[in-house]
Each structure stands twice: as structure tokens, then as C-alpha cells.
């Protein structure tokens, strides 16, 4: 209607031509026009008006016309809308109208109106609405029950007609013909009515339920049915498709017409199934097992019937009667009895009949019944048949259940058109295939597009037009006081300058010199103690030093100094009258406990004495530091072992034996062996860092092996300025003992020694001596074959096994000897070499991994900028004037 408010009186005036004085619709034509107006109604007033008009209409033909035109569907739409909007008055009006309409089961199955009404009867908040809905539901249930009960009667009539036709061949034909004629008149009406009901009742659970409710005693039936079952099977074999129906009808019908009447209802169920699929369904529950088979077997009923007979004969044919088959769920009581055969017959009849359209059903039924009727009449016994028929009629209302093993469960879900559809379920595979093709095409196009994508702009860039903006109406900050405050503030602070380059290019590269990574050895050899090692000396050696334990009393300055001296020794050579470092230290220190470290620095001649010590060793000059240990390195204050100055200090041997006279032990522990024997004594070993020393007596045992480096057959180690170690010469064994004609090599300073075969090496500079000549520290001796090198004033001697040899020379008559280095000032420091009763000798590794001439390394930036480097002598770079000659 119009969008404005609607006056119901005006609406009724407009409809006056279609309505009577009482508001009832006059004719069928008027109801169709009113329905067309109802479809357009959107307002609640107009809808209620139309509903009242329908309520006032009493003529059944008008109401039926209203339903046929689509009024029932329209009411369903209005009911759904009013239920969603919870419009109670409109819901009540619609329910009253539905109650007034003559609805059938077919109408109720068309949509979900019945479902909505049932929901309202249970869940509605309004009590009156609930009552009204429950009344409507009960009314509809009554309609459903009445229709389900009427259907079997109609089936009976049809069966009787069929039997009459079939008995035209039999002598009893006249009785059946009369019945058939009487029912033939009723048939057309039933046919008209049935098409609707048949369609709606396709799954007809209503009938199934009604039959289930009507249970009767099944005991008598089995005995009489046995004979009928046998006959049926015979008939089936003769004519499989038609015989089955005929057998069902003929077995009971031949005996007597009244029996036929009772029996026909059972057969009518299959007939109805044949006529219309919908009708077939209601009786099928009784036929239980054959229902689905009948639907499936429609195209080839004969073949399927035979198969089913086989199945029924072993399982249900003998024990299951009519009801047993029809109710797959029902035949528990009668499985033992041979009744199952008759149910097989109706099942078979239903199966062939299901495919037949409703219009053709009567003709097909008649033909089928006539043919099997003749066959059935012969085998059926007249006396037993009438009883069976009557009982069968009764049994029609009885329910029997098969044995547990024969029970089958079927689920049938009827889809309501108005129900929600599962979207995920593929209904049309064609559509799914199209979607798949489209998705594949899309994926292919995107892949092709991406493969040719150069990440370049396809559209040329154009400079946008400049925007012409009107001058601002207000100058921003014109009245602001904060800008003046900020200006005053900026006068007293530094201006923030950001010197960003105007170009987007990378900044200029900073000068950078790659620094080799610092090597941090993981061995305990290089672990630096927090405090310098202090060795307590035991008295009892030959000749005690005047300072006693003075080595442990060195102040930090001297400790660093001695660390920098490295392998420097007092230059007391065979012909040298150099400065005695030991005496200078003694004069500086005085008595061991006389002065604290601070007072030593205040002595007037302190610096002069230090210069005297350092100048000969090149520590203050441009020359390289010989085997300089960094202050913090293993040879410095933290890692260096301080030995008391002065000759002959008693020293405990490494094995606990009495020590011989010792010289100043000012050298730190050697670096980790490189290529030789990795074993070396811990920081507590008094042998570490000093010359080989020990008493003239036999050594405790071969505990110490000669320290070996690389000898004549092996190339020297690659790193620059690593003190060469005593090594194998002449292919000596890897533990550092010289081979035949080779002497042990003593590690020296920075320069690589030049040796003859088996020559020994010292530290520092090179000096060429004669064969067997000795070398002081800081000099290189070039020995002849088997040449020897000693420490400062130390001599290497080699004697026969087990005895000490003379000092100052090494006999050449011993072809194979061990190399050992004696650096102590007195010539007594010789430990017998490995021999009979002789202790093992250790060749000393001179040199350190750091220190020496590093002028071939890059210059240390920190040292050049600040004048010092925090790594000091540990630094891996060149410090001019410290670990190499000063820059020119």
C-alpha cells in the first residue's frame, strides 16, 4: 500500500466489491485478487486486515483456492518475519488464520511453517501464543494421523480392483470383478487425491509410525503363512516381476474374497508404492528390508527381485512373514516362523512398482495382478487362504521384529526446500570445475606477470604541477611569546648544526687499517697471575746469594724493567768485562729488607745505575729489544718468575732434589712450544725461563725432556719476530734433542739464527765464532758442525754418559749428544744429559711470541697519536723506538 498511514476502513471500502456484508470473500476470483494485494502489503495494519478477511471466509472452495494460489506460502513468509521481529499480535493473527485454513499433509510438507509453529508452542515467551500454537500443532497432528489411516483404505480398494482383474482367468472371477467394479468408480477420485499425498508422503514416516503403534499378536500368522510363502516362491520363479505382486495378492485372495479384503491392505502398500514413489514410502516401513531396494531396483525389477529372493530365502524368507519384511525393524517375534516369504512378495511388488508413474499405476497394477492371479490361484489352498487373509489383514496392524542379526537401520533425511543449505557441500560439480579453471587461470596470469616484472616503473614520472595556494589569512605565530623566549634561549646555547651533505651518496670512507685479531692463547701456559710469582729459596746450595730472596723483593719498576730485558744476560763473555747486571741490582736494592720500593726511586744514582744496566742491552737505544717480554705478558710482572740475583743461589730442582748453584733467573717462562713438544712446566717450575741448571750429581730421572723447536730440516716458523726456539737439528727427534752431530738450540732474540748443520742458536745479534765457540746473550754464534751456543758466560759441554764434562768446550768425538743450554754465570751449571744414570735434560726455548724487531709490522696508531699504547709490549703493531728502530 502507500507509504503513509493506512486507514483500515478505507482499505475495506476499496475491497467492498470482493466482500460480502459480513466481510467474507464472495467468489474464487475475488480471493485471487485479494491474494495479489496481500503480496504487496508491507504495513502491519493492512496485513491484519487481510488476515481478518480470510478468517471471515467460510467457503471451503475459496479457502482451497487461496492455498493453491500461494496463500499458504505467503503466510509462511509473514510468519517468519513476525517471528524474527517478535511481533506477538501479528503472530497470533497468523496462527488463527492457519488454523482456519483446510491444510493437508502435502501442504504442511511444502515449507517449514509446521516447524515454526512447533517452535512457538515450546519456546514462545507469550503464554497465549504458546497455547494457540500448541492447539494448532495438535490439530495438524490429527490431520496427519487421519490421512495416514485413510491411505491404507485407498490401497485396499485398489488392490481389490487388481485382484478382480487378475481373477478374470480364475473361476472365482465374478466376485472379484464385482468388487473391482465398485472400487473402479472410487478409483478416479482416489487417483486425483493421491498424487498430492503420494508426493508428500514419499518418505511417509507418518504411516510408518502409525503401523508401528498398532501392534497385534503375531503368533497365529506364522503357521498359516508358511504355505503361502512356498507358493509365493514358486510363483516368483515362474514370473519374477509380476508374480511377486500377484503372489502377495493371490495367496490370500484365492481362498476367499473377505480374506482378500483384509489381505489387500497389505498388498495395497506395495501398490501405492508402485503408483507413486511417495505412497510407496509409507507402506515401505512395514516392508522394511525392501524399501530402499525397491527404489533402486525400479529400472530392472525382475533381476533385483530374484536377487532379493535369494537373500530373503536364507535370511528372512522362511522365518519372516509379511510384516517381517516390511518392517526391517519389526520382525523380531516372527523370524522363527516361515512367514518371511510373504513379506518378500510385497517387497518385490513394491520394487517393480516404484518406478511406475502415478497415472499409469492402475493399468500396470491390473495387468500384473491379472497375470499372477492365474498363477497364484492354482497353488493356493482354498481352506487355509481365507483364514490367512483375515489374519493378514489384522497383521497389517501388528508389528514384528526380526532377530538381532537381521536387523537393519536406515536413515532418511528429507530436505526441506526452505531449509538452510550447506554452502560447503558441492551441489554442482560443473560449477566447481569452472571455479577451479578460473583460479588456475588467475594463478597463471599472476605468475606470468611476476616473472616479467623488472621492478621498473611502467608509467613515466612527470613532475606535478606546482600548487598555487592563497596567502595565509593568519601568519602562524604572529602573536606568540614563546618564539621570543626561544630566541633568547638560543642566544646562550650552542647552535644545533647538522652537517648533512646535500647529496644522497654514501659518505666518504674513513681511513681504516685492518687489524689482525688478537690471539688469546687458551693454554694455561699463558695465563697471567694477578701477582708476580714469588719463589721461596731453600738454603743449602753451594754459595748463597748476598740478597737471599731479593728476587721476590724487586719493586714493580724493576720488575717491569727486567721483563722488558727479556733474555738479556749480563754480558760476561769469555773475554768480556762488561757490566754485571747482578752487581748493579745488588747495589740498587741493598739489603733485601732495607728499603721499601718508594725509597729506592729516591736514590740519587738510581737512574744512572739503571742506564748502566739497560744501555748494553739496547733497551734505551734504537736497537731491538732482545726477547723483550711485555710488562703484562708472561714474562712481565704477572707471569715472570723472579729469581734472586747473585750466583750460586740454592734452588730446588724440579724433582725435589738439591739444586746446584744458580744465576740470576730473570727470564720469564717461554712461550708455548710451536711445533715441538707441547709439554712445559707450569709457572711454578723453577726450570722455566732459566738456563738448564742442576747439581753435578745424577739427575732424579728423565722427567724433563729436551725442549725442541724446528731444526735444520724444518723451515723456521712464519711469524716475524718470534724468538727461534731450540730445535731439532740434523733431523733430531721431535722432543728437541739433537740428532747425531746436532746440538740443542736455545731460543734467542728476534733475529733468525744462521747455523751450520746442527748449530745452536742464541738470542739477539749474530756473532761468528770458531768451532765450538761460545756466545753471550744477544749474540749469534755461527758454529761449525756440532757447534755449540751458551748462555751468558755459559758453556755447553758434552761428555760421556753419566759424568759432567769440562766447561767451555764441547768435545766433538761424541757423535750423538743431547743439546742443552747453560746460561748461568758460573761454569758449574751443567746437568748431566740423558745417559746411564744421567737425568733428562731440557733444551730451553728462548724467545717470546712478542717483542723484538716489529718494524715490518704496521705502525700502531694509538702509539703515534698518544705516545703510548695500552697494550705496551703486547701490542701486535710497530712502536717506533720501543719494539723496533725509531722512524727516520
UniProtKB/Swiss-Prot annotation:
GO MF entries: DNA binding; enzyme-substrate adaptor activity; protein phosphatase 1 binding; protein phosphatase inhibitor activity; protein phosphatase regulator activity; RNA binding; zinc ion binding
UniProt feature, compositional bias: Polar residues: 325-334, 583-595
Region of interest (Interaction with TOX4), residue spans: 1-348
GO terms for cellular component: chromatin; chromosome, telomeric region; nuclear body; PTW/PP1 phosphatase complex
Modified sites of kind Omega-N-methylarginine: 665, 693, 737
A Pfam family the protein falls into: Med26
Pro residues bias spans: 644-655
UniProt modified residues of type Phosphoserine: 313, 382, 545, 591
Motif range (PP1-binding motif): 394-423
SMART domains: TFS2N (SM00509), ZnF_C3H1 (SM00356)
Top-rank lineage group of the source organism: Eukaryota
Modified residues (Phosphothreonine): 398
Compositional bias segments (type: Low complexity): 248-258, 674-690
Main localization category: nucleus
Positions of crosslink type Glycyl lysine isopeptide (Lys-Gly) (interchain with G-Cter in SUMO2): 179, 262
Keyword terms: Chromosome, DNA-binding, Isopeptide bond, Metal-binding, Methylation, Nucleus, Phosphoprotein, RNA-binding, Ubl conjugation, Zinc, Zinc-finger
Known function: Substrate-recognition component of the PNUTS-PP1 protein phosphatase complex, a protein phosphatase 1 (PP1) complex that promotes RNA polymerase II transcription pause-release, allowing transcription elongation. Promoter-proximal pausing by RNA polymerase II is a transcription halt following transcription initiation but prior to elongation, which acts as a checkpoint to control that transcripts are favorably configured for transcriptional elongation.
Protein name as it appears in the record: Serine/threonine-protein phosphatase 1 regulatory subunit 10
Organism: Mus musculus (Mouse)
Amino acid at each position: 500500500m502507500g507509504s503513509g498511514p493506512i486507514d483500515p476502513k478505507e482499505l475495506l471500502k476499496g475491497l467492498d466489491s470482493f466482500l460480502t456484508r459480513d466481510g467474507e470473500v464472495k467468489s474464487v476470483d475475488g480471493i485471487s485478487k485479494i491474494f495479489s494485494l496481500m503480496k504487496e502489503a508491507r504495513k502491519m495494519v493492512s496485513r491484519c486486515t487481510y488476515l481478518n478477511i480470510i478468517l471471515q471466509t467460510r467457503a471451503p472452495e475459496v479457502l482451497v483456492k487461496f492455498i493453491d494460489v500461494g496463500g499458504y506460502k505467503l503466510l509462511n513468509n509473514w510468519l517468519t518475519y513476525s517471528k524474527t521481529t517478535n511481533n506477538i499480535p501479528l503472530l497470533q493473527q497468523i496462527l488463527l488464520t492457519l488454523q482456519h485454513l483446510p491444510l493437508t499433509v502435502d501442504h504442511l510438507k511444502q515449507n517449514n511453517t509446521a516447524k515454526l509453529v512447533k517452535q512457538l508452542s515450546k519456546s514462545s515467551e507469550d503464554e497465549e501464543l504458546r497455547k494457540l500454537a500448541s492447539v494448532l500443532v495438535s490439530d495438524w497432528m490429527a490431520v496427519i494421523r487421519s490421512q495416514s489411516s485413510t491411505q491404507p483404505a485407498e490401497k485396499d480398494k485398489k488392490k481389490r480392483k487388481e485382484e478382480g482383474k487378475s481373477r478374470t482367468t480364475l473361476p472365482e472371477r465374478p466376485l472379484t470383478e464385482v468388487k473391482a467394479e465398485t472400487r473402479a468408480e472410487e478409483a478416479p477420485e482416489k487417483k486425483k487425491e493421491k498424487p498430492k499425498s503420494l508426493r508428500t508422503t514419499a518418505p511417509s514416516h507418518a504411516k510408518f509410525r502409525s503401523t508401528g503403534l498398532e501392534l497385534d499378536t503375531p503368533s497365529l500368522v506364522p503357521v498359516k503363512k508358511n504355505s503361502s510363502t512356498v507358493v509365493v516362491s514358486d510363483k516368483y520363479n515362474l514370473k519374477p516381476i509380476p508374480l511377486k505382486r500377484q503372489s502377495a495378492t493371490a495367496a490370500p485372495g484365492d481362498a476367499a474374497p473377505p480374506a482378500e479384503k483384509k489381505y489387500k491392505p497389505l498388498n495395497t502398500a506395495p501398490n501405492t508404492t508402485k503408483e507413486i514413489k511417495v505412497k510407496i514410502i509409507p507402506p515401505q516401513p512395514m516392508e522394511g528390508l525392501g524399501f530402499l531396494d525397491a527404489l533402486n531396483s525400479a529400472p530392472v525389477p525382475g533381476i533385483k527381485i530374484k536377487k532379493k529372493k535369494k537373500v530373503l530365502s536364507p535370511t528372512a524368507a522362511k522365518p519372516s512373514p509379511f510384516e517381517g519384511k516390511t518392517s526391517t525393524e519389526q520382525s523380531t517375534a516372527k523370524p522363527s516362523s516361515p512367514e518371511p516369504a510373504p513379506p518378500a512378495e510385497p517387497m518385490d511388488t513394491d520394487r517393480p512398482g516404484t518406478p511406475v508413474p502415478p497415472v499409469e499405476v492402475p493399468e500396470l497394477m491390473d495387468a500384473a495382478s491379472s497375470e499372477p492371479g492365474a498363477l497364484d490361484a492354482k497353488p493356493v489352498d482354498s481352506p487355509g487362504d481365507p483364514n490367512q487373509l483375515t489374519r493378514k489383514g489384522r497383521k497389517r496392524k501388528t508389528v514384528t521384529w526380526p532377530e538381532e542379526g537381521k536387523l537393519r537401520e536406515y536413515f532418511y533425511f528429507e530436505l526441506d526446500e526452505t531449509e538452510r543449505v550447506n554452502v560447503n557441500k558441492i551441489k554442482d560439480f560443473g560449477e566447481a570445475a569452472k571455479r577451479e579453471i578460473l583460479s588456475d587461470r588467475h594463478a597463471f596470469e599472476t605468475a606470468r606477470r611476476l616473472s616479467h616484472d623488472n621492478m621498473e616503473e611502467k608509467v613515466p614520472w612527470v613532475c606535478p604541477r606546482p600548487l598555487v595556494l592563497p596567502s595565509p589569512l593568519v601568519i602562524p605565530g604572529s602573536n606568540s611569546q614563546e618564539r621570543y623566549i626561544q630566541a633568547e634561549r638560543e642566544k646562550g646555547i650552542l647552535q644545533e648544526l647538522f652537517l648533512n651533505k646535500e647529496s644522497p651518496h654514501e659518505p666518504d670512507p674513513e681511513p681504516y687499517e685492518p687489524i689482525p685479531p688478537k690471539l688469546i692463547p687458551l693454554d694455561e701456559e699463558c695465563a697471567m697471575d694477578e701477582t708476580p710469582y714469588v719463589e721461596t729459596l731453600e738454603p743449602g746450595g753451594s754459595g748463597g746469594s748476598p740478597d737471599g730472596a731479593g728476587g721476590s723483593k724487586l719493586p714493580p719498576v724493576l720488575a717491569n724493567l727486567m721483563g722488558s730485558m727479556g733474555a738479556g744476560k749480563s754480558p760476561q763473555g769469555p773475554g768480556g768485562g762488561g757490566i754485571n747486571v747482578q752487581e748493579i741490582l745488588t747495589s740498587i736494592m741493598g739489603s733485601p729488607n732495607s728499603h721499601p720500593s718508594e725509597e729506592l726511586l729516591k736514590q740519587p744514582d738510581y737512574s744512572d745505575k739503571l742506564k748502566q744496566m739497560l744501555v748494553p742491552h739496547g733497551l734505551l737505544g734504537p736497537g731491538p729489544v732482545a726477547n723483550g717480554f711485555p710488562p703484562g705478558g708472561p714474562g712481565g710482572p704477572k707471569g715472570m718468575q723472579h729469581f734472586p740475583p747473585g750466583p750460586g743461589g740454592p734452588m730446588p730442582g724440579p724433582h725435589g732434589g738439591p739444586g746446584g748453584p744458580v744465576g740470576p733467573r730473570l727470564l720469564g717462562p717461554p712461550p708455548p712450544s710451536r711445533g715441538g713438544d707441547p709439554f712445559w712446566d707450569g709457572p711454578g717450575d723453577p726450570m722455566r725461563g732459566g738456563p738448564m741448571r742442576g747439581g753435578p750429581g745424577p739427575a732424579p730421572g728423565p722427567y724433563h725432556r729436551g725442549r725442541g723447536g724446528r731444526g735444520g730440516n724444518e723451515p723456521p716458523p712464519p711469524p716475524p719476530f718470534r724468538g727461534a726456539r731450540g730445535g731439532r737439528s740434523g733431523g733430531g727427534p721431535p722432543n728437541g734433542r739433537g740428532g747425531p752431530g746436532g746440538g740443542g738450540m736455545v731460543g734467542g732474540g728476534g733475529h733468525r739464527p744462521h747455523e751450520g748443520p746442527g748449530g745452536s742458536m742464541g738470542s739477539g745479534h749474530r756473532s761468528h765464532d770458531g768451532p765450538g765457540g761460545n756466545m753471550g746473550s744477544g749474540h749469534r754464534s755461527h758454529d761449525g758442525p756440532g757447534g755449540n751456543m751458551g748462555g751468558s758466560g755459559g758453556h755447553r759441554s758434552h761428555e760421556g754418559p753419566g759424568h759432567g764434562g769440562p766447561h767451555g768446550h764441547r768435545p766433538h768425538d761424541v757423535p750423538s749428544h743431547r743439546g742443552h743450554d747453560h746460561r748461568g754465570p758460573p761454569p758449574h751449571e751443567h746437568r748431566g744429559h740423558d745417559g746411564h744414570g744421567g737425568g733428562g735434560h731440557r733444551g730451553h726455548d728462548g724467545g717470546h711470541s712478542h717483542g723484538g724487531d716489529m718494524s715490518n709490522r704496521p705502525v700502531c696508531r694509538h702509539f703515534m697519536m698518544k705516545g703510548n699504547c695500552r697494550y705496551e709490549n703486547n701490542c701486535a703493531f710497530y712502536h717506533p723506538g720501543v719494539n723496533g728502530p725509531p722512524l727516520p
